[in-house]
């Protein structure tokens, strides 16, 4: 375990003590700051607006790149595949996060805490500090019961019921809930019984200034005319298997052999995806370059002709889609509520689960350069006007202004009594 810090940001006073910089503790579950783009944006926004920032996360050499944030790291547990393995993995992360939280409170203090991750177990770390007047913010990106269903194909059993209970307990414990889209906002209000006004939607688009197009690198096309790109973390819910089966249909049934497909990223399903590509006989058309730093990842998007988003989760806003749109890259997706709400005419939609239809849409887009250009233009405009992180910073900062202001009023009220 170790901590490191960079240059301090401009000073913002705490609501509890006007002479001290307000400090926010951000805890992410079993992931590093270097791999969590949303966390990176939140850290940068808070620092640039005068907050002190403490981060608790998994150890990663890339964590050292964020000046102004004090990062408290713990050794990453071994990745698990079984249910028991997941208990060990996340149990280790919870113990380390709890210990580091207590250490930070004693040595640095903090004025508010934000937790994020699935399963919903970190509210148990924040609850004791609520008794000390530190508000707890839940940054909800996914729904644990739904992720369990995607992974194991069931909505029953003791584990599923436990996840539902943990979700309800987390909603009850949170002083404010941040969600990534309107569907999760409604879940918080209906399933979570969160009081009106205590949920804020903060999207997850890239920062405008970081999305300037890079010079295309034709070698990424591996000698072929076109490049299709998939970008992101590789988990069961991302359905890389669906994308690979669509590529199989495109190459081996339709006969399209002038396109290369790059799956850029890393995660627990990468090795299985590589094996599936070999089994389908499409390994000559597919590459898995691994995790890429931002500039390299964005070079792929600047070079690509079509993006791929095979996710089948109805209420998830696809981060991939926002990144594709930021670079004017049209993409193929399944016709799901939040995907269509996000992208509109910037994407082409197949019936959910229709692998053949997904492949046919890729084929048509590759043959229609004017349509690709128009879709890309629409996507970039939507990104700039509505989806970019620049548009999310205001609502995000308002959450902390509101909570710290309330905390100050409560302290003044107790003093007057």
Regions found by a protein language model. Give the residues of each.
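N-terminal subdomain of nucleotide-sugar transferases
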Residues: 2-67
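Conserved donor-binding/catalytic core segment of Leloir-type glycosyltransferases
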Residues: 25, 178, 219-247, 262
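Membrane-proximal helix-turn-helix segments that form the acceptor-binding/catalytic region
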Residues: 44, 102, 124, 128-132, ...
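An aromatic- and histidine-rich active-site surface loop
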Residues: 94-97, 110-133, 137-147, 184
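Acidic donor-binding loop of glycosyltransferase active sites
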Residues: 175, 298-316, 329
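Carbohydrate-associated surface elements
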Residues: 183, 205
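Nucleotide-activated donor-binding/catalytic signature segment of Leloir-type glycosyltransferases, i.e.
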Residues: 271-292
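Conserved acidic donor-binding segment of nucleotide-sugar-dependent glycosyltransferases
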Residues: 347-356, 364-370
């Amino acid at each position: 375990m170790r901590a490191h810090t960079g240059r301090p940001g401009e000073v913002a006073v705490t609501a509890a003590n006007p002479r001290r910089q307000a400090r926010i503790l951000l805890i992410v579950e079993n992931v590093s700051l270097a791999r969590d783009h949303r966390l990176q944006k939140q850290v940068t926004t808070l620092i640039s607006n005068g907050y002190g920032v403490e981060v608790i996360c998994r150890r990663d050499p890339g964590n050292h790149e964020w000046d102004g944030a004090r990062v408290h790291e713990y050794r990453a547990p071994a990745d698990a595949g079984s249910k028991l393995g997941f208990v060990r993995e996340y149990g280790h992360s919870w113990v380390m996060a709890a210990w580091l939280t207590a250490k930070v409170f004693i040595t640095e203090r903090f004025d508010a805490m934000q937790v994020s991750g699935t399963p919903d177990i970190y509210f148990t770390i924040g609850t004791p500090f609520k008794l000390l007047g530190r508000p707890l913010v839940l940054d909800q990106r996914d729904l644990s019961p739904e992720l369990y269903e995607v992974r194991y194909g069931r909505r029953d059993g003791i584990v599923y019921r436990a996840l539902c209970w943990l979700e309800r307990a987390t909603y009850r414990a949170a002083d404010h809930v941040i969600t990534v889209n309107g569907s999760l906002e409604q879940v918080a209000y209906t399933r979570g019984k969160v009081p009106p006004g205590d949920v804020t939607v903060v999207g997850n688009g890239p920062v405008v200034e970081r999305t300037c197009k890079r010079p295309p690198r034709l070698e990424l096309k591996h000698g072929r005319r076109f490049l299709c790109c998939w970008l992101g973390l590789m988990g069961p819910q991302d359905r890389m298997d669906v994308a690979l089966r669509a590529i199989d249909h495109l190459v081996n049934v339709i006969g399209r052999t002038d396109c290369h497909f790059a799956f850029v990223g890393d995660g627990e399903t990468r090795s299985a995806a590589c094996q599936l590509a070999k089994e389908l006989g499409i390994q000559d058309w597919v590459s898995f370059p691994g995790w890429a730093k931002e500039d390299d990842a964005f070079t792929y998007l600047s070079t690509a002709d079509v993006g791929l988003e095979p996710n089948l989760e109805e209420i998830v806003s696809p981060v991939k889609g926002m990144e594709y749109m930021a670079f004017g890259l049209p993409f193929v997706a399944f016709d799901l509520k939040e995907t269509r709400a996000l992208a509109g005419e910037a994407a082409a939609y197949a019936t959910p689960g229709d692998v053949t239809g997904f492949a046919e849409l890729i084929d048509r887009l590759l043959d229609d350069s004017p349509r690709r250009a128009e879709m890309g233009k629409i996507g970039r405009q939507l990104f700039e006007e509505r989806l970019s992180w620049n548009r999310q910073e205001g609502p995000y900062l308002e959450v902390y202004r509101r909570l710290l202001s309330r905390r100050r009023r409560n302290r003044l009220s107790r003093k007057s009594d």
